[in-house]
């Protein structure tokens, strides 16, 4: 994952992705994720099929999916980084989801994406759980997932983060939707065996 700096102010206009954006989204995902597929909590998804928000003029993308009353941020990227575009996308998405009645926004990231961890913790996310060895498992599905992350940190584990979208919403202590059907930590996975789509082990990079 690329480093994430603290953003400057942004005047980016954020809008829902349209059918005309499909080719650009595929190209953007290939540039930032190495493929149009992304992998997380043991599943592979065609990210171009997800709903998304676009920061004009096509300099940022946030893709997501609904999971009942919850939602998952799948990818978040901005070009160039550290200009506030990622923050603009994230805040636009949380406003939209809150207005739609969504209660929590989740994301998953690698243990070595320290810049992204700082970015999200400063924007209201809290750590919910760690899945030891989950990145090693995901690498079997997508071998291009890096072995080494920022600062030479080996990438082995997935971190789930949660942001409550309302003042009375529980903070996600029960774990993300994909883990609730199977929460035995003894196997190191802590995730549902039911098919669920997700992100490339990091709700974001380059924001």
Would you name each region that the model predicts?
Residues 1-20, 159, 165-195, 206-207:
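Conserved N-terminal entry element of GNAT/NAT acetyltransferase domains
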Residues 16-83, 87-91, 96, 164-165, ...:
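Acetyl-CoA-dependent GNAT
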Residues 50-52, 155-160:
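Short hydrophobic/aromatic beta-strand or adjacent loop that forms the aromatic wall/cage
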Residues 87, 112-150, 155:
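Conserved active-site alpha-helix within GNAT-family acetyltransferase domains
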Residues 97-111, 115:
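Conserved GNAT acetyl-CoA-binding A-motif
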């Amino acid at each position: 994952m690329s480093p994430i700096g603290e953003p400057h102010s942004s005047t980016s206009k954020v809008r829902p992705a349209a059918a005309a954006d499909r080719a650009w989204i595929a190209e953007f995902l290939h540039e930032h994720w190495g493929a149009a597929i992304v992998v997380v909590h043991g599943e592979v998804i065609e990210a171009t099929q997800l709903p998304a928000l676009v920061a004009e003029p096509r300099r940022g993308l946030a893709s997501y999916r609904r999971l009942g009353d919850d939602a998952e941020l799948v990818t978040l990227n901005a070009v160039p980084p550290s200009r506030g575009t990622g923050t603009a996308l994230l805040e636009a998405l949380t406003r939209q989801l809150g207005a739609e009645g969504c209660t929590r926004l989740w994301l998953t990231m690698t243990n070595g994406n320290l810049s992204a961890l700082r970015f999200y913790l400063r924007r209201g996310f809290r750590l919910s759980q760690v899945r030891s060895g989950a990145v090693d498992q995901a690498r079997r599905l997508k071998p291009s997932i890096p072995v080494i992350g920022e600062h030479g940190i080996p990438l082995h584990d997935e971190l789930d983060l949660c942001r409550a979208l309302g003042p009375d919403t529980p903070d996600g202590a029960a774990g993300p939707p994909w883990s609730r059907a199977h929460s035995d930590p003894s196997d190191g996975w802590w995730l549902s065996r039911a098919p669920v789509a997700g992100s490339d082990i990091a709700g974001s990079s380059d924001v």
